[in-house]
Amino acid sequence: MAVRGINKVILVGRLGKDPEVRYIPNGGAVANLQVATSESWRDKQTGEIREQTEWHRVVLFGKLAEVAGEYLRKGAQVYIEGQLRTRSWEDNGITRYVTEILVKTTGTMQMLGRAAGTQTQPEEAQQFSGQPQPESQPEPKKGGAKTKGRERKAAQPEPRQPSEPAYDFDDDIPF
């Protein structure tokens, strides 16, 4: 089997504004996101830390678009997996181009961390994909410290007590 090429983009960044969701004539949802990614380095000549931010246009389709519109807000950190697409159009006789990351039903969007002003714990990241996700099984621990031929059990952290009462949201989840 010959592979003609791979078009895959992975981004981890923050939303610059709330998602813009619209519905196309067939009823499908489309969401536009503006995602900022930053990298920093130390300038070799001056020794000061430099930072460069890139802005990416991300387009989500279907259920992912609906979920993004409902749960993502400006400042939210997201993991995006999609493919690059450049399209063009005519604007008053001038050809315009835009490059976007498309996240179709085979792509992935995962909410990471928490945005400013939210109460979500960082370990409560949620992943959304256009494909059904298998139920995750806890991975068995590998290795570990041994004492005189016996495996030493790690101290189990005490469960955290929630500051607010726990609610059952299973019925309200749209996927």
Curated annotation (Swiss-Prot):
Single biological process term from Gene Ontology: DNA repair
Residue stretches of biased makeup (Low complexity): 126-136
Keyword list, A-Z: DNA damage, DNA recombination, DNA repair, DNA replication, DNA-binding, Plasmid
DNA-binding region, residue range(s): 55-61
PROSITE patterns reported for this sequence: SSB (PS50935)
GO CC, one annotated term: nucleoid
Coiled-coil residues: none
Pfam families: SSB (PF00436)
Limits of the SSB domain: 6-110
Region (Disordered): 113-175
Claim: DNA-binding is one of the keywords in the record: yes
Keyword DNA repair: yes
GO MF annotation: an example: single-stranded DNA binding
Motif (Important for interaction with partner proteins) on chain: 170-175
Highest taxon listed in the record's lineage: Bacteria
Subunit description: Homotetramer.
Function: May contribute to the conjugative processing of DNA. It has a functional relationship with Psi (plasmid-mediated sos inhibition) proteins.
Protein known as: Plasmid-derived single-stranded DNA-binding protein
Source organism (scientific name): Escherichia coli
Organism ancestry: Bacteria, Pseudomonadati, Pseudomonadota, Gammaproteobacteria, Enterobacterales
